[in-house]
């Protein structure tokens, strides 16, 4: 079964340009630690001065969440996030 992880969070629009290079480094850190390269996306619209960003990781192993959480605790990136990061799992229907 192919497990995909989507992590979404809010970034204040006023900080988005400054936050972006930090997130590129974060994605590199995750790839180096897990061997899984992710994709960084955002909603096209901004609501109430906040953008919604999302990290997407495909074909992750069961231990991925724990590794990602540990890396996040060490990252220092909380300053760029408005609220909590939400982690969601999806599976390919073709694999059922």
Predicted region positions:
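Short S/T/G/P-rich N-terminal loop/turn motif that feeds into the first structured element of a domain
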Residues: 1-69, 88-96
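Acidic/histidine-enriched active-site and ligand-binding environments that engage anionic O-linkages
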Residues: 77-91
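A common structural junction motif
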Residues: 27-31, 72-81
């Amino acid at each position: 079964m192919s497990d995909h992880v989507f992590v979404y969070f809010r970034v204040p629009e006023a900080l988005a340009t400054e936050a972006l290079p930090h997130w590129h480094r974060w994605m590199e850190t995750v790839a180096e630690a897990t061997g899984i390269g992710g994709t960084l996306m955002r909603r096209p619209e901004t609501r109430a001065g906040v953008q919604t960003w999302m990290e997407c990781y495909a074909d992750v192993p069961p231990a991925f969440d724990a590794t990602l959480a540990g890396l996040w605790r060490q990252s220092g990136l909380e300053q760029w996030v408005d609220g909590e990061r939400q982690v969601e799992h999806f599976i390919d229907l073709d694999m059922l």
